[in-house]
């Protein structure tokens, strides 16, 4: 479902947010530190900070639905990936460098548009993480312009 060019975009270090909802249809969400595309693009692992996971994980386990918004700050290219919850487990030490590497790439992107990391993100706790695995069900362009909302996969 996620081809190689899209995988490379998603894994480069972007501003990422995961949204879900509770049984009363109230939205819930969190920042995502990094993602990894797996299984030839059929699945995606979102690394979400442990500090913010309890309610999000509860909602994912209850309804199984998630939407991830990806945006590159320097040009506003954006993608939405919808998915179904497969599993969640603590991310391990081997994954830490990969995850924080993507986070560092986002900080570099933010610096290019004038948002210094020390002023905009210094209090965010981005590790340790929970690795949330999703089966990709739909992908949409969210880049502003005439193609916004178009199906990518």
State where each predicted segment sits.
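Short, basic/aromatic recognition patches
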Residues: 1-15
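Charged, amphipathic alpha-helical segments
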Residues: 1-4, 49-55, 117
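A generic local secondary-structure boundary/capping motif
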Residues: 6-7, 57, 119-124
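Short beta-strand segments
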Residues: 11-49
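A generic structural signal for short beta-strands and their flanking turns/coil linkers
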Residues: 12-14, 42-43, 62-66, 77-84, ...
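Short acidic, glycine-rich loop/turn motifs
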Residues: 20-24, 70-74, 138
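A short mixed-secondary-structure module that forms the rim of ligand-binding clefts
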Residues: 34-75
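Charged, gly/pro-rich active-site loop segments
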Residues: 78-153
């Amino acid at each position: 479902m996620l081809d190689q060019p899209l995988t490379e975009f998603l894994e480069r270090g972007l501003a990422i947010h995961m949204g879900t909802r509770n049984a009363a249809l109230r939205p819930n969400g969190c920042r995502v530190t990094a993602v990894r595309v797996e299984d030839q693009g059929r699945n995606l692992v979102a690394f979400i900070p442990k500090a913010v996971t309890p309610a999000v994980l509860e909602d994912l386990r209850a309804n199984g639905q998630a939407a991830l918004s990806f945006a590159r700050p320097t040009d506003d290219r954006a993608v939405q990936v919808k998915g179904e919850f497969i599993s969640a487990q603590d991310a391990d030490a081997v994954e830490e460098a990969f995850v924080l590497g993507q986070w560092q790439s986002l900080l570099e992107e933010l610096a290019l548009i004038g948002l210094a990391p020390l002023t905009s993100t210094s209090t965010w706790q981005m590790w340790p993480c929970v690795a949330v695995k999703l089966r990709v069900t739909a992908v949409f362009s969210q880049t502003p312009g005439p193609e916004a909302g178009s199906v990518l996969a």
